[in-house]
Amino acid sequence: MSIDGENDVVALKRVGAVVAEARDTMASHVAPGVTTAELDAVGREVLRRHGARSAPQLAYRFPGVTCISVNDELAHGIPSQRVLRAGDLVNIDVSAELDGYWADSGASFPVGDVSPRARALLFSTRAALSDAIAEVRAGAPLRNIGRAVERRAKRTGFRVVRNLCGHGVGRHIHEEPQVPNTFDCNNPVLLHEGLVLTIEPFFTTSATRAVESDDGWTLRTPDGSIGAQFEHTMIVTCGAPIIIT
């Protein structure tokens, strides 16, 4: 969506704050022995308390309130009785609707002590999000976002998942434009003031694409390599973007 006045900004900040609270509250419960269903219940309670609705349930009838993906699962993991174990990486992706406005955010977290390689993956993916956000301003080419993400991956020895990307958001969970995590010199799209979008780099230790699991939802690496994702929703301005999550 594109902002059409201050009321839009206020409403987006409101739903963004709820999404961020759910994400962070769920993260505070990440520990060995916790199930992904238990984490999902934490997120459900935060959304319920604020009168927000789960975006994946509302838009796609997803079988969970939030998406929780572990290790080689990259996105859309279904909350279940799976028990988190020390050394795992868990991704928490929360998106919600409140009063007709939508926001989306995700982050990956270590479960207990993780390997140095896994910790480096988390650091690099989080840094890629920061690098990409620094490219966001009205009039800038959309392709600069993917260039920043790819450069971070190359510098740190990780791989970009090429078939997962960010997206427009605001009046629905997935809107135009797509926001690729790779550089395409032929992409003519320019960012404009008031555009609402997400940026969400996905890095892995070796895979460059995600494949669908037999459950019809979960996207994972085809080679079993671990992945990480970080995501924010933001509003494009003539200066630094407004991060609402």
Functional labels for PLM-detected ranges:
Residues 1-245:
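Active-site neighborhoods and metal-handling regions in enzymes and metal-associated proteins
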